UniProtKB/Swiss-Prot annotation:
Impact upon substituting residue 492 to N: In BBS6; uncertain significance
GO molecular function: ATP binding; RNA polymerase II-specific DNA-binding transcription factor binding; unfolded protein binding
Originating organism: Homo sapiens (Human)
Top-rank taxon: Eukaryota
Residues forming coiled coils: none
GO CC terms, sorted: centrosome; ciliary basal body; cytoplasm; cytosol; kinociliary basal body; motile cilium; nucleus
Protein name per Swiss-Prot or TrEMBL: Molecular chaperone MKKS
Stored InterPro entries: Cpn60/GroEL/TCP-1 (IPR002423), GroEL-like_apical_dom_sf (IPR027409), GROEL-like_equatorial_sf (IPR027413), MKKS (IPR028790), TCP-1-like_intermed_sf (IPR027410)
């Protein structure tokens, strides 16, 4: 018997944020996420030391899922961001950068964690209240009767992901397809509570991006030989569909729970086949036109159905079961017994289609709330990133449908918000502190650390040595290229602000980001004509941004409040 190793005592560390190891690892994580941020963010290649799949990305969801972290504090931070991204899809890097900078900034102040956390909560509440208010100067309404703002929102997501490797023309094409795919999921006669359909992304790797398209209904990939064997159906009415979630292969090992009793001298295989053929006879008598099976259909049953001009398709997989149920109105059949008439559904029509080298069986719905986005890209790496980006964009559109507002992007919301907080804390600190135990000096220190963290997110957009400025009227971001001459006439160097709403021809005064300047009131209440005339805005999802802001501050507060880290080393 081998000797058992004695248990090691748990490792207990006090004041974890004061250790050099923790500060270094936080700094490394911050540099990784910061370098990925924005349209010119740098790509990361992630792979393990034993080879295998290599992930090339700049997206937080792919980055953090492939990034192995071991320190408990980093695990808290990455888990918080991953939970946010799993719920909202967008603003993961924003959340990570803001959280890391908040932790770094307040550590330098020497204030007690209790004071820092209390004031951070006040500032977070101030931010959320302002961003949700009617007077907010960086929030615009989204009109679903017009595609202009919706296209801007989708385009902003695509352009922020450089690993997709899209040209401007390709970006416009894919943006329009994503928007069309989303609009197809909205029921035409929706009243009250809306139940959205689903957009399925079908891979077409190695094809031109411009060949991507959207089709109503579901595409089932098949070989050319299989398609040739399918009999054409000519019918003026809808086609009746039966959908099976159990195997029709006759395999007795897949009978589900329970006991199979077989009489002596009876062939089990023949008994099961007879039952399958009886099932086929019921399908024929019920005038079914199309049989779909998640698993395998026995060749004899398939031939029997084909003889009676019923199309039978098997091995469709679990992924398509939910969309097929929604689109056809079927109830998946899970047994070989008698079929309830309510289990059947229908489709408007079926046809075959070919895209690139792939062949598909196309199910055309009665009502187009399920659609297929055939997504093309040059190679596997670019396609994987584009697929993830399209899923993000579709989710953002769903969130925007629930809360039809968008925030100005390109860093303008962050600089505007920082200007608003500075003005509020300098000119009306009593409204923030109220009956709190904190002093105005502590509020000024924390507010500056908070605003500096917001501006650090903005600074992360610049990766090529350029300068970032803010104007003293709107509080928006303006970028200057690294090789620009140092002149006082900024309008000659600046064209548009980060979000694209304002141009430099207005009478504006600028200052460098993070430079010392007097607090000012950023203009609120966006003029309707300014928003309506802008056709190429950079926008962010309001719901995702608010959640990211909240997660960043709350996670930073949680980490700052840690007094001990206890690790079980066994």
């Amino acid at each position: 018997m081998s000797r058992l190793e004695a248990k090691k005592p748990s490792l207990c560390k006090s004041e974890p944020l004061t250790t050099e190891r923790v500060r270094t690892t936080l700094s490394v994580l911050k540099r990784i996420v910061t370098s990925c941020y924005g349209p010119s963010g740098r790509l990361k290649q992630l792979h393990n030391g034993f080879g295998g799949y290599v992930c090339t990305t700049s997206q937080s969801s792919a980055l953090l899922s492939h990034l192995l972290v071991t320190h408990p504090i980093l695990k808290i931070l990455t888990a918080s961001i991953q939970n946010h991204v799993s719920s909202f899809s967008d603003c993961g890097l924003f959340t990570a950068i803001l959280c890391c900078n908040l932790i770094e900034n307040v550590q330098r102040l020497g204030l007690t964690p209790t004071t820092v956390i209390r004031l951070n909560k006040h500032l977070l509440s101030l931010c959320i209240s302002y961003l949700k208010s009617e007077t907010c100067g960086c929030r615009i309404p989204v009109d679903f009767s017009s595609t202009q703002i919706l296209l801007c929102l989708v385009r902003s997501i695509l352009t922020s992901k450089p690993a997709c490797m899209l040209t401007r023309k390709e970006t416009e094409h894919v943006s329009a397809l994503i928007l069309r795919a989303f609009l197809l999921t909205i029921p035409e006669n929706a009243e009250g509570h809306i139940i959205l359909g689903k957009s399925l992304i079908v891979p077409l790797k190695g094809q031109r991006v411009i060949d991507s398209t959207v089709l109503p209904g579901i595409l089932i990939e098949m070989s050319e030989v299989q398609l040739m064997r399918l009999l054409p159906i000519k019918k003026s009415t809808a086609l009746k569909v039966a959908l099976f979630c159990t195997t029709l292969s006759g395999d007795t090992s897949d009978t589900g729970e329970g006991t199979v009793v077989v009489s002596y001298g009876v062939s089990l295989e023949n008994a099961v086949l007879d039952q399958l053929l009886n099932l086929g006879r019921q399908l024929i008598s019920d005038h079914v036109d199309l049989v779909l099976c998640q698993k395998v259909i026995h060749p004899s049953l398939k031939q029997f159905l084909n003889m009676h001009r019923i199309i039978a398709i098997d091995r469709i997989g679990v992924t398509l079961m939910e969309p097929l149920t929604k689109m056809t109105g079927t109830q998946p059949i899970g047994s070989l017994g008698s079929i309830c008439p309510n289990s059947y559904g229908s489709v408007k029509d079926v046809c075959t289609a070919k895209f690139g080298s792939k062949h598909f069986f196309h199910l055309i719905p009665n009502e187009a709330t399920i659609c297929s986005l055939l997504l093309c890209n040059r190679n596997d790496t670019a396609w994987d990133e584009l697929k993830l980006t399209c899923q993000t964009a579709l989710h953002v559109l769903q969130l925007t449908l629930k809360e039809p507002w968008a925030l100005l992007g390109g860093g303008c919301t962050e600089t505007h918000l920082a200007a608003y907080i500075r003005h509020k804390t300098h000119n009306d600190p009593e409204s923030i502190l109220k009956d709190d135990e904190c002093t105005q000096t502590e509020l000024q220190l924390i507010a500056e650390a908070f605003c500096s963290a917001l501006e650090s997110v903005v600074g992360s957009l610049e990766h090529d040595g350029g300068e970032i400025l803010t104007d003293m009227k709107y509080g928006h971001l303006w970028s200057v290229q690294a090789d620009s001459p140092c002149v006082a006439n900024w309008p000659d160097l600046l064209s548009q602000c980060g979000c694209g709403l304002y141009n430099s021809q207005e009478e504006l005064n600028w200052s460098f980001l993070r430079s010392t300047r007097r607090p000012f009131v950023p203009q609120s209440c966006l003029p309707h004509e300014a928003v309506g005339s802008a056709s190429n805005l950079t926008l962010d999802c309001l719901t995702a941004k608010l959640s990211g802001l909240q997660v960043a501050v709350e996670t930073a507060n949680l980490i700052l409040d840690l007094s001990y880290v206890i690790e079980d080393k066994n």
